[in-house]
Amino acid sequence: MALRSRFWGLFSVCRNPGCRFAALSTSSEPAAKPEVDPVENEAVAPEFTNRNPRNLELLSVARKERGWRTVFPSREFWHRLRVIRTQHHVEALVEHQNGKVVVSASTREWAIKKHLYSTRNVVACESIGRVLAQRCLEAGINFMVYQPTPWEAASDSMKRLQSAMTEGGVVLREPQRIYE
């Protein structure tokens, strides 16, 4: 009963002379005429408002903090990879220049933890690298800076995390800023 009333309602609407559907039309003229004048589209606005703040980063034009040469780790980045290793867990964060965490992965997460034998060893670091690389690509972050301390860079677990990130498609080096 409900289908019948809906059908007749649609049928009566389509029988109106003002209703133009391509499937029901037998004429060869287009169903709708464009209302916008194409000459009007060629005018360029004198001011440009950037509504996407990431656009400047992707074009390598955005500002980087350059006055922190004597500080370690350097503050000259748009996105930075931070790895935090505790007694029981490994956590990797992607931090934006303003200090906010954009993407993170940790062995505290149950979805990662249930696949690991240990939440601290080399395999855990490699798994965190794979998961974080996938999440970064899903978030649109392809480049980031990784500045490990010398003793972190020498460890096998950090080397495996770096290789998992690069194999996942993330470049651990940001492009140079264009100053012109």
Curated annotation (Swiss-Prot):
Which purpose does this protein serve, as stated in its record? Answer: Together with thiosulfate sulfurtransferase (TST), acts as a mitochondrial import factor for the cytosolic 5S rRNA. The precursor form shows RNA chaperone activity; is able to fold the 5S rRNA into an import-competent conformation that is recognized by rhodanese (TST). Both the cytoplasmic and mitochondrial forms are able to bind to the helix IV-loop D in the gamma domain of the 5S rRNA.
Q: Mind telling me what this protein is named?
A: Large ribosomal subunit protein uL18m
Family matches, as InterPro entries: Ribosomal_uL18_bac/euk (IPR005484), Ribosomal_uS11_sf (IPR036967)
Query: So what family is this one in?
Result: Belongs to the universal ribosomal protein uL18 family.
Oligomeric state and interaction partners are given as:
Component of the mitochondrial large ribosomal subunit (mt-LSU). Mature mammalian 55S mitochondrial ribosomes consist of a small (28S) and a large (39S) subunit. The 28S small subunit contains a 12S ribosomal RNA (12S mt-rRNA) and 30 different proteins. The 39S large subunit contains a 16S rRNA (16S mt-rRNA), a copy of mitochondrial valine transfer RNA (mt-tRNA(Val)), which plays an integral structural role, and 52 different proteins.
Write down the species: Homo sapiens
Subcellular location(s) of the protein:
Mitochondrion
Under the cellular component aspect of Gene Ontology, which terms does the record hold?
Answer: extracellular space; mitochondrial inner membrane; mitochondrial large ribosomal subunit; mitochondrial ribosome; mitochondrion
